[in-house]
Amino acid sequence: ISDSLVIIGYKEVVNFSFISKNYSNTKNQLLIENPISKDKSIMRESLLPGLMNNVSYNTKRQQKSIRLFEKGKTYHRNNKEIYEINIISGILSGYKSPTDLVLNTYKYGIDDLKADILSIIPNVKFNVNRDSIYFDSDNSLKIYLNETLIGECGMISSSLMNDFDIKDCVFAFEIFEDKISLDPNAAYKEISQFPAVYKDITVVANKQYKILNLIDKIHKNSYKYMKNIRIKDIF
């Protein structure tokens, strides 16, 4: 899953396993006896607070498109028993393609989040989720694979966004890694032996000619070798 997230544009981060007790939704918090600071006083029950801090840090440094993920353990207590859960969490915020002349006004939405989840774990299903501490109650979904609950996703709640001083909408997912079984019938494509080649193409066309039609013609004549087209400028 980590490799798949990197391929579709996510960057991996690593955060402390300690968070503020304000971001815990249980009474069975695992308190740290001598915390290094108040905002690192309990063992984390989710990776999302750390990722939210990453988003806040990057947005304050003029990063307009953010797609991050983290893979790690969360820590829980059930009565006297302490146990760990392996989690993979991803988060996205900002513009989908800030350098693209056409797409630079499009911001990430929940549909982009769902598409990313489906690209790394096909055949998952989504159901409404009303009981999450981290997600907005009207924009939260549970993730199922073969009728098994494997995680949740949605738009981060406004209260949590305010805690981290984030203005743009933030979307995230958390997946229980141990509940995912690999498909034995999965098919794999051979990786190309040739390096990627980037080309700048200048086209002179009538003003009435639609750009999307031009892109479509280029795609159809690329013999499936071309992976992506971006419009850099119009003059």
Regions found by a protein language model. Give the residues of each.
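A carboxyl-terminal module marker
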Residues: 103-235
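Extended, well-folded interaction surfaces typified by the phenylalanyl-tRNA synthetase beta subunit core
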Residues: 1-69
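Short, glycine-/Ser/Thr-/acidic-enriched flexible segments
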Residues: 18-20, 37-38, 58, 73-77, ...
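Conserved alpha/beta core surface patches that mediate binding of polyanionic ligands
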Residues: 13, 45-91, 169-184, 223-235
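Hydrophobic alpha-helical scaffolding
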Residues: 4, 37-45, 61, 80-81, ...
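A glycine-rich phosphate-binding loop feature that marks nucleotide/adenosyl-phosphate handling sites
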Residues: 17-28, 67-77, 90, 128-143, ...
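Intrinsically disordered or highly flexible coil/loop and linker segments, enriched in small
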Residues: 10-19, 42, 57-68, 97-99, ...
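Short, hydrophobic beta-strand segments
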Residues: 1, 31-35, 84-104, 140-144, ...
